[in-house]
Each structure stands twice: as structure tokens, then as C-alpha cells.
Curated annotation (Swiss-Prot):
This is Mating-type pheromone BBP1(2). It is found in: Cell membrane. Residues 63-65 form a propeptide. Keywords: Cell membrane, Lipoprotein, Membrane, Methylation, Pheromone, Prenylation. A lipid is attached at residue 62 (S-farnesyl cysteine). GO terms for molecular function: mating pheromone activity. It is a lipid-anchor. Activates B-regulated development. One of its GO terms (cellular component) is plasma membrane. It comes from Schizophyllum commune. The modification Cysteine methyl ester is found at residue 62. InterPro entries: Pheromone (IPR012597). The keyword Lipoprotein applies.
Amino acid sequence: MDAFTDFSILADGLASLGDESSHTILAEFSPSILDGPFVADSAPLTEAPCNHDQIADYGSYCVVA
């Protein structure tokens, strides 16, 4: 499974949460997600820790939704 597929599965999970936006979703991605086009094109990295506006924790970085 590649990083994009992992992200798609996570996005589906987020959609199923509905209005429960206070939940923090943490997911482990392969290192390739940090080098991939998704992050470069549409998801700026921020310093950890993640909060409910951010969907993935990778080491000391978060991928912002």
C-alpha cells in the first residue's frame, strides 16, 4: 500500500467522524509521504504535536488537513 492509499483510507475515516472534530486522528505513514506530491502540493508541514485540525503525525511533523 502506498502513502496515497494510506491517506485515502484515513480521509474516509475522518469523513465517518462527522461533527466529532475534537477527536485527534494519528496515523503512521511510510516516510515516502513526506517526499510525495501530495505533501508538496497541498499539505504544509507544521511542528508537532498535532491537533484536531491536523490529520497525521509523522515523527516531529504533522500533515495539515
